[in-house]
Regions:
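Conserved donor NDP-sugar-binding/catalytic core segment of glycosyltransferases
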Residues: 101, 105-144
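A conserved acidic beta->alpha catalytic loop
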Residues: 40-49, 71
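Glycine-rich, basic loop-to-helix element that forms the pyrophosphate-binding segment
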Residues: 67-88
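Active-site and donor-binding regions of nucleotide-sugar-utilizing enzymes
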Residues: 442-445, 449-603, 623
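Short, well-formed alpha-helical segments that are part of the catalytic scaffolds
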Residues: 12-26
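Conserved catalytic-core segment of nucleotide-activated headgroup transferases in glycan assembly
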Residues: 258, 462-476, 598-683, 758
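Catalytic binding pocket for nucleotide-activated donors in carbohydrate/polymer assembly enzymes
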Residues: 588-589, 682-687, 712-783
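Conserved nucleotide-sugar donor-binding catalytic segment
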Residues: 155-243
Length: 799
């Protein structure tokens, strides 16, 4: 059999050699059986020259076409039209993407299958997508739909495809004989043009069959730079509006009969990824205005009108688990699953407690928990809320229960319905497996020594861990302690002289101490610590999160990923924002304590009044930072200097108004941006009167300063503790809360902040010039905080 490949090409010069070699070197004879039509969709790189080089070698097999840029669908359509106009006699066509590549047996497997299935009723062949992670050079057979290929070759009637859905045109073969005049929808961007095309084709040929071949392997490249088609699709309005309207809804409306299960499942699969993303990253929808958000929600509900509840319940996809099935049924269908499940999420071997969670949508439900037929002792509980758009998607009840050694049976009833129990993805009838794991963890914990390991950043100290270490060193001299810090740190010699036991954050000895430590106490949550010995590094250790500052925004998305045993907070509002019900955090009164920050003891003690120093301390932007390197530091981002952040702060720092404050009023100006920004200091090209190098403690800066200017940084709380004024310069508020690593929380800068908020630097300077001689008059401080003996309080909680 002969085959045609149509490939849409756009700026893929660095991938074309892999693409061509994988096709030319096929086990099935390339020259006799495989023809390639490459449609250059207006590439601006060297793609055309590379294609023409291969075309010279194989003029009968390779066709090159050029068109102005119009998108993948228009390029593929040009290829299909070229086939028709030139009367191609190849019965099968596929749409291999030119940044991907094929297994050597790819065409051979398809050809062998067709040779043994000549009954002419196969209209589509689906092939096995293997993900190739370019950065790690890793092949992973973990595509969400790979269950289709876990057994031998599968042949299914199109009317009964059900879960065997096909969304990729690149990894399937279409029989030209049945294609008629069907083309890709050129209006559909950034995705679903493949899925719509294939499934319109299957609906047109509902009485034919499709085959799925496990050994025909298609290697999908996950690009190192994150520029694969699927990586950026959620950054466009079309993903939320056009795809739902012209993609999903059009597919449903064009179906001439009842929408078959496979077509429902295609849309359910694609729409699920949208829902999943928006529950965990609601800020992604900020690209839509209010009218567009309303339209998006309306389109979601219209699409779900075509999707049967039965398909939602039965959909076979690992990621589409109980949580999403229950939530989607509740949200879109106002229905519930017939069964309910409680999940045992975590085991605390130290306190003989287990964390049980279950999902619900009725706040007024009644719960009864029995351990061996006796009412269980609930140690801590929490209601976590999941939202989708402007409505609750689902609630999660989190309960810590105390176990006894001989506890055998756990029964949980919600509104008299008994919940099934799941542990490690398996249903369980009793607690035997739980107790085995509990005892195994206890044995592992016995291997810990009485060592406390402290860390701020691997390359910087001068934060809460340093201050708490110093307190323990002086007040609990018998306690075994060590401090993790690179020898290259500017703090290394200072702490060494003071008697700190310093440990290099790499090598065998570092890992050995992580293995032996009973408590790891850090102001940051860095991968080099929590992943030092693999994913279970902290399982049988206490991780004490001292924090880098006071949480004022919603950090739940980041912090919920981590195991934290003691979570330090400093203000009543911060504490309540984390442990309270109906928020996004997983943490409860079990982990979260109100003590104040360790560094505050020294801060208050060393405060200096009547100084003339302005401290400028903007925070960082995750989206402007380079890639994370080893030990938490980040590489330079060459695009940083083009950013609004850089331009606005450079304009501010180089302004005549700032210089006037220094010269006319005799103020020192100190610019100390976030540590992740300091690598760009030279780019700001600042005047000599601005101090940027500071080798002392960061605390001294707060104590010696009379005013702070920041944007969103929680260091403003340090000035509030000292009852000193703060001004906020926020020129990018909308962008910041959409693109940074957290979303807006309980803290309103205008109501709760410690000074005026300005979007324009000229307004800030105008205000400051009026108030410069009476700075104490502009102090705003309504905070309820914990500031007495903070180190002592923290150690008491740790012990």
């Amino acid at each position: 059999t002969q085959y045609t490949i149509i490939s849409a090409v756009y700026n893929v010069e660095k991938y074309l050699d892999d693409y061509f070699k994988s096709i030319i070197n096929q086990r099935l004879d390339f020259k006799k059986n495989i023809f390639i039509i490459l449609v250059d969709d207006g590439s601006t790189d060297n793609s055309a020259q590379i294609i023409k080089t291969y075309q010279k070698k194989y003029p009968k097999n390779i066709i090159y076409l050029y068109k102005e840029n119009g998108g993948q669908a228009s390029a593929r359509n040009l290829g299909l039209k070229y086939m028709q106009e030139n009367d191609y006699q190849t019965p099968w066509v596929t749409f291999t993407d030119p940044d991907d590549f094929l297994d050597r047996n790819y065409f051979y497997e398809v050809d062998q299958f067709l040779a043994t299935h000549k009954d002419n009723n196969i209209c589509m062949i689906g092939c096995n997508i293997i993900l190739y992670h370019e950065k790690q050079k890793l092949y992973k057979d973990n595509h969400p739909l790979n269950f289709k290929f876990k057994n031998d070759i599968q042949v299914k009637e199109n009317c009964n495809l059900d879960n065997f859905i096909q969304l990729s045109a690149a990894s399937c073969f279409i029989n030209i004989r049945y294609l008629n005049k069907l083309l890709f929808d050129e209006r559909l961007k950034p995705n679903f043009e493949d899925a719509k095309f294939i499934n319109e084709y299957l609906l047109e040929n509902i009485n034919l069959k499709s085959a799925f071949l496990p050994k025909a392997k298609y290697f999908y490249r996950k690009r190192e730079d994150g520029s694969s088609t699927l990586d950026d699709r959620d950054k466009t309005k079309d993903y939320y509006i056009t795809v739902l309207n012209l993609g999903y809804l059009k597919l449903f409306k064009d179906t001439k009969t009842t929408v078959p299960s496979f077509a429902q499942n295609v849309v359910l699969y694609d729409i699920f990824w949208q829902i999943k993303t928006l529950i965990s990253n609601p800020e992604k929808l900020a690209i839509l205005n209010d009218k567009e958000k309303y339209l998006f929600k309306e389109l979601l509900f219209k699409n779900f009108n075509f999707i049967d509840s039965r398909n939602i319940k039965n959909f076979n996809l690992n990621a589409f688990d109980f949580f999403y099935k229950k939530g989607i049924l509740s949200y879109f269908k106002n229905e519930d699953l017939s069964e309910n499940i409680a999940f045992i999420e975590s085991i605390d071997d130290k306190n003989d407690e287990i964390l049980v969670k279950y999902y619900f949508n009725d706040i007024d439900h009644k719960i009864k928990i029995l351990l061996d037929d006796k009412v269980a002792a609930i140690k801590h509980s929490k209601i976590r809320q999941y939202d989708l758009l402007d409505k609750v998607f689902l609630y999660e009840k989190r309960i810590w229960l105390k176990l006894k050694n001989d506890t055998k049976i756990l029964d949980i009833f919600v509104n008299s319905q008994k919940l099934k129990l799941v542990f490690n993805n398996n249903f369980i009838n009793d607690l035997n497996e739980i107790l085995k794991v509990l005892n195994k963890q206890k044995k592992q914990r016995l291997k810990n020594s009485d060592l406390w390991l402290f860390a701020d950043m691997s390359w910087r100290a001068d934060d809460n861990a340093e201050h708490l270490y110093r307190y323990v060193m002086h007040n609990h001299p018998k306690q075994k302690i060590a401090f993790i810090l690179s020898k290259n740190s500017i703090d290394y010699s200072r702490l060494k002289k003071e008697g700190f036991k310093l440990i290099e954050p790499k090598g065998f000895y570092f890992k050995y101490l992580i293995y032996k430590a009973d408590k790891i106490i850090s102001s940051h949550i860095d991968r080099y610590i929590f992943n030092a010995l693999g994913g279970d590094t902290l399982k049988t250790k206490d991780f004490i999160f001292l924090q880098h500052g006071v949480i004022k925004d919603d950090l739940s998305r980041w912090l919920n990923q981590r195991k934290i045993d003691i979570f330090i907070t400093s203000t009543k509002a911060e504490y309540n924002s984390i442990i309270g019900d109906f928020n996004q955090y997983k943490f409860s009164t079990k982990e979260v304590v109100l003590t104040g920050l360790a560094r505050w003891d020294a801060l208050i003690k060393n405060n200096i009044l009547n100084t003339k120093q302005i401290l400028i301390m903007p925070t960082w932007r995750e989206y402007l930072s380079g890639k994370v390197q080893k030990y938490g530091a980040r590489a330079r981002n060459p695009e940083f200097v083009k950013s609004l952040y850089f331009q606005k702060w450079q304009e501010f720092l180089c302004s005549k108004e700032l210089e006037k404050l220094a010269v006319q009023y005799g103020y020192s100006i100190v610019f100390i941006p976030h540590p992740q920004i300091r690598i760009y200091l030279e780019d700001f090209n600042l005047s000599s009167y601005i101090i940027t190098s500071y080798k002392g403690s960061i605390q001294e800066l707060f104590c010696r300063s009379s005013l702070m200017i920041t944007d969103y940084s929680s260091v403003a709380f340090e000035m509030a503790i000292l009852n000193k004024p703060v001004l906020y310069y926020q020129f990018d508020k909308d962008e910041f809360f959409v693109r940074h690593s957290y979303t807006k929380g309980y803290f309103d800068y205008n109501k709760d902040g410690f000074g005026r908020v300005f979007a324009d630097s000229s307004d800030l300077f105008l205000y400051l010039n009026k108030k410069i001689n009476h700075l104490q008059d502009i102090v705003i401080n309504n905070m309820q905080y914990q500031i007495n003996d903070t180190c002592k309080s923290i150690v008491a909680k740790i012990r």
